[in-house]
Every structure is written in C-alpha cells, then in structure tokens.
C-alpha cells in the first residue's frame, strides 16, 4: 500500500487450536491483520518453526497482503489450545519453547521499523530472554513520533513487573482490559476504583491514549483533552477471540488518520463487536465497518 501509514505487530504468531479447527492467531498478528484491512501498510515481526504449521502461517500472511518479517527457526511453530465457555469467552493454554520465543529481527525488519508510524506489542512474547531483548531493542529504533502501543495482554504467568515497567516506559499508548487493570494495580500498589486506577496510570506515565476495554460493560478512551466512554453493542457472540486486537487496530487506524477521539472510539467498538459475532480472531471486515 504505497503511501499508507506503516504499522508493525511484533511478538507471537501462532495457531489458535479452537474446537472447530485451527485459526491463525497471536495478538500482534491479529492486530496487523485488521490494521491491513483498515488500509494500513501492515507488517509482522515474529518467528515460526521449520515445519508444516510454520509454512502454512507464512503462506497465510502472504495471501493476506501483510508484509512478513517472519524467521524460520529450529523450534516448533507456536500453538495455543483454546476452550470456550458457554459465553464464548476463551480459556488459553499457551505452549512454551516455541518459535516466537526466539524472535531475531532481520535488517529489513529494522529498516521498516525505522520508518514505522506505529508498533504494537504486548507482554506475552517477552516471556523469553531472546524475544524480550529483540522487542525492547526494536522499540528503540521506531521514530519518536510513532505510536508505540503496549497492548498489555497478560496471559497465564507470562508477565512480570520488569516486563511491564520497561514496556510502559517505551509506550505512548496503553490498552488494558478490566481484569488486567486490577492485576496492574496490585503489582504497582495503586488503589482506588476502576476509574481512579485508570486515571492514575494515565497521569503517571507519558501516554497519549489509555484504552480500557471491559467486555460487555463498555470501554473507555482517555486522552490529555478528553475522556470517552461507550457502551458495548448488544450482539450475538460467537467467540471473543481477537476482539481486543481488532479494537487496537481500529484505535491505531483512527489515531494515524487524525480522527476525533469519539469517532475513533466508535469505530474501534464497532469493529470489535463485529469480530465477536464471528468465529476466530481474523474474520473479513465488511465495508461499512471499515469506513
């Protein structure tokens, strides 16, 4: 997409093993997929194994039109076993010692990062020393003017205070959900109700935007100028896998296109609500959602 804003998802790329079959996943990958659908020049920095699952991922990314900075390494391609509860809420078992635990960005990936308008990352891929170092160093190469989106994505035991603190220091956008914000508050000794905690986090860090998503209970966007709250649309939920990642993509697309905060928020909410009505994390977005 010549002339489009350049965005990166760096971190895990994997197969979500859902009850009905496997789906391409990983939060930064889902973000990149939806960002591409929203007209951004989208890329993924990650790793896959030298196996059939890895080759399938590379082919999927290519067919989706996403720029691939995905290395093949001597580890198995990542998988996540997912079971859905009666409300379509996923429970994850994230397998360890896999390819995306050994991310080493190529020279071409770093060159792309040097020109990036936004980069999205989380805690999960930083569970290993190799990928932690690679992600932290890649963040240093992104222009100061870029959006550095820390979509915290706390999973299982794969996060700690050091990862969160060092990531937040490099971020200027934080996305966090209603469960994660309570864990965050406990780790960093922040007290108060949800709204007070949200504002303390925003005030204590150099953030342009804080996004708090609360599932069926709505969402907040906080900026220096205003707060925006929106209810979650009442939709028939197939599953919620990838809904938060699509919200992040909508948020980033709106910010890069300099839209008003309320308009950005509405778009992000509508995108994530649609994703909840579909199976898997990366359904094709209808045109009216992308406008």
Locate predicted features.
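Substrate-binding N-lobe of the ribokinase-like
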Residues: 6-7, 17-89, 96-102, 291
């Amino acid at each position: 997409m010549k002339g489009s804003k350049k965005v990166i998802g760096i971190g895990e790329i994997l197969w979500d093993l859902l009850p009905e079959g496997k789906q391409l996943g990983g939060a930064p990958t889902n973000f990149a997929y939806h960002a591409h659908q929203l007209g951004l020049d989208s890329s993924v920095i990650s790793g896959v194994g030298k196996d059939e699952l890895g080759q399938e991922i590379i082919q999927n990314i290519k067919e989706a039109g996403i720029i691939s900075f995905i290395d093949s390494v001597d580890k198995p391609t990542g998988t996540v076993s997912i079971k859905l509860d009666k409300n379509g809420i996923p429970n994850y078992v994230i397998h360890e010692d896999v390819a995306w635990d050994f991310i080493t960005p190529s020279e071409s990936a770093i060159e792309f990062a040097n020109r990036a308008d936004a980069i999205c990352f989380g805690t999960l891929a930083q569970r290993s020393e190799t990928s932690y170092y690679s992600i932290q160093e890649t963040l240093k190469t992104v222009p100061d003017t870029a959006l550095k989106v820390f979509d915290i994505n706390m999973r299982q035991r794969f996060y700690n205070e050091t990862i969160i603190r060092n990531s937040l220091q490099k971020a200027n956008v934080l996305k966090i959900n209603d469960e994660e914000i309570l864990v965050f508050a406990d780790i960093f000794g922040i007290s108060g109700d949800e709204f007070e905690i949200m504002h303390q986090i925003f005030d204590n860090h150099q953030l342009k935007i804080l996004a708090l998503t609360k599932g069926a209970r709505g969402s907040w966007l906080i900026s220096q100028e205003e707060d925006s709250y929106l209810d979650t649309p009442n939709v028939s939920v197939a599953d919620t896998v990838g809904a938060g990642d699509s919200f992040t993509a909508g948020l980033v697309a709106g910010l890069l296109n300099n839209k008003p905060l309320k308009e950005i928020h509405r778009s992000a909410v509508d995108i994530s609500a649609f994703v909840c009505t579909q199976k898997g994390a990366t359904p094709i977005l209808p045109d009216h959602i992308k406008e």
